[in-house]
């Protein structure tokens, strides 16, 4: 049966939203050491804004969650995808280079995929098959995480909960905390902290004049304060979301700064949710874990992920550390309640992805991940050198895969549009990370080397 014209139009609309990125064909001056001889074409399907639903005459009697109505427009990255798709409709032949969403691009090292393939093949045998695993993660992987990242820090394998990624665990932690808490976030910060807080009913309405939600404490992080908040001016909150190295600014907190943060949490009886997703990018003596700070086990939870180390953005594997020393106000262990949340809401990470995690933590896997991180850090240097040569002030980059570029006095969405329109390069507007991001754009170093070089050329041409 032939498709109707309407159906064809709908299909065209959908395909424009889920089409793979179009990359430049410009080649680097030397071959990529991480690139395989041949690469299969990839189709990236994103969570993008849905087209308006066709009106129907029937409505259920189920009320909408009022908290969903508080959310502002679309989530940041789907909105960027929508604008990118619209740009392609306007310029169908454009070779768009994406330096926007922080998605990895380089192949997962063989030592890691071989471990996953071996586990996957074993599932086809009687002896190798396994069904549901422990919701908290496989004992061997939890032990390996503890030994690799928390040796001598007093963190045990039973404190570690393996997950399908840090972002998912952030929402599970929000379920754990409930709706009757007040949170603080760095400003700017990763949007998932604020949006999950809104969905949980922890916030007031969005205040358009200041671009903030009520009942959230926005801790300003700017070049003027070294991207670390003035804690003396921050009121008490129950939960403090803190990411270091920070997304989007790329700033890594020093040992002295984190010591102040832990003391601040202790003085106020708060819990820190410490996002260490980019810790492996730290190249100086900045702490890679909050638990390097004395007393942190009594006030902190740490989330982490293999996504940006091993290219697991699609594989999905991370972990959260909830120390047994961390207690609620009534003396009940936080870990016991989080374990109940995990057992209720989650059946455990894929056994194949966990096999990949063990591959990551083998000596060969750790070396391979270090090489991948080094590759992206080389990309970061190219981006930094490009903007610096053009006279821009740039921040971050040293300990993170993000470059935070300042466009004083300009609207960050306008800068995003200018770069997309004139250079066909996607960045991320800083205001999408909070009001403190206005006047900045985040440029991601996740990209193939030839695309980073070509993007640098276009940016130099645009702003020369």
UniProtKB/Swiss-Prot annotation:
Cofactors: pyridoxal 5'-phosphate
Transit peptide (first-last residue): 1-39
Pfam families per record: Aminotran_1_2
Gene3D superfamilies linked to this entry: Aspartate Aminotransferase, domain 1, Type I PLP-dependent aspartate aminotransferase-like (Major domain)
Amino acids binding pyridoxal 5'-phosphate: 132, 247, 275, 278, 305, 307, 316
Localization annotation: Plastid, Chloroplast
Record InterPro entries: Aminotransferase_I/II_large (IPR004839), DapL/ALD1 (IPR019942), PyrdxlP-dep_Trfase (IPR015424), PyrdxlP-dep_Trfase_major (IPR015421), PyrdxlP-dep_Trfase_small (IPR015422)
EC number(s) on file: 2.6.1.83
Enzyme class: transferase
Catalytic reaction list: (2S,6S)-2,6-diaminopimelate + 2-oxoglutarate = (S)-2,3,4,5-tetrahydrodipicolinate + L-glutamate + H2O + H(+)
GO molecular function: L,L-diaminopimelate aminotransferase activity; pyridoxal phosphate binding
Example of a GO biological process term: lysine biosynthetic process via diaminopimelate
Known partners and oligomeric status: Homodimer.
Protein name: Probable LL-diaminopimelate aminotransferase, chloroplastic
Species this protein is from: Oryza sativa subsp. japonica (Rice)
Gene designation per UniProt: AGD2
């Amino acid at each position: 049966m032939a498709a109707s014209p309407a159906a064809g139009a709908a299909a065209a609309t959908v395909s424009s939203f889920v089409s793979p990125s179009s990359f430049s064909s410009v080649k680097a001056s030397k071959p990529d050491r991480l690139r395989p001889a041949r690469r299969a074409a990839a189709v990236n399907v994103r969570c993008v804004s849905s087209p308006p639903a066709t009106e129907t005459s029937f409505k259920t009697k189920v009320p909408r969650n009022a908290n969903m109505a508080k959310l502002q427009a679309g989530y940041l990255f789907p909105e960027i995808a929508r604008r990118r798709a619209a740009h392609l409709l306007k310029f169908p032949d454009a070779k768009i280079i994406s330096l926007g969403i922080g998605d990895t691009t380089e192949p997962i090292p063989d030592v890691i995929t071989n471990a996953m393939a071996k586990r996957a093949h074993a599932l086809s045998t009687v002896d190798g098959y396994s069904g549901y695993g422990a919701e908290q993660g496989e004992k061997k992987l939890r032990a390996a995480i503890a030994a690799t990242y928390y040796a001598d820090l007093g963190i045990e394998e039973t404190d570690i909960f393996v997950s399908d990624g840090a972002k998912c665990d952030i929402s599970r932690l929000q379920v754990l905390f409930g709706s009757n808490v007040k949170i603080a976030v760095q400003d700017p910060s990763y949007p998932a902290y604020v949006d999950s807080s809104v969905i949980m009913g922890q916030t007031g309405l969005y205040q358009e004049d200041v671009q903030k939600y009520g009942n959230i404490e926005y801790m300003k992080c700017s070049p003027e304060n070294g991207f670390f908040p003035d804690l003396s001016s921050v009121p008490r909150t129950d939960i403090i979301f803190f990411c270091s190295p920070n997304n989007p600014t790329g700033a890594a907190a020093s040992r002295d700064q984190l010591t102040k943060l832990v003391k601040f949490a202790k003085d106020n009886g708060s819990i820190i949710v410490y996002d260490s997703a980019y810790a492996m990018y730290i190249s100086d003596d900045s702490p890679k874990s909050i638990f390097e700070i004395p007393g942190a086990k009594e006030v902190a939870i740490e989330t982490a992920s293999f996504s940006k180390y091993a290219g697991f953005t699609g594989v999905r594997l991370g972990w959260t550390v909830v120390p047994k020393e961390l207690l609620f106000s009534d003396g009940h262990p936080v870990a016991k309640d989080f374990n109940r949340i995990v057992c209720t809401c989650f059946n455990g990470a894929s056994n194949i992805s966990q096999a990949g995690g063990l591959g990551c933590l083998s000596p060969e896997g750790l070396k391979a991940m270090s090489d991948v991180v080094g590759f992206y850090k080389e990309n970061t240097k190219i981006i930094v050198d490009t903007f610096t040569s053009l006279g821009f002030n740039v921040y971050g980059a040293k300990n993170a895969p993000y470059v935070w570029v300042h466009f004083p006095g300009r609207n960050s969405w306008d800068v995003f549009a200018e770069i997309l329109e004139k250079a066909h390069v996607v960045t991320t507007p800083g205001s999408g990370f909070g009001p403190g991001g206005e006047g900045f754009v985040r440029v991601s170093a996740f990209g193939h080397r030839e695309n980073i070089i070509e993007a640098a050329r276009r940016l130099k041409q645009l702003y020369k």
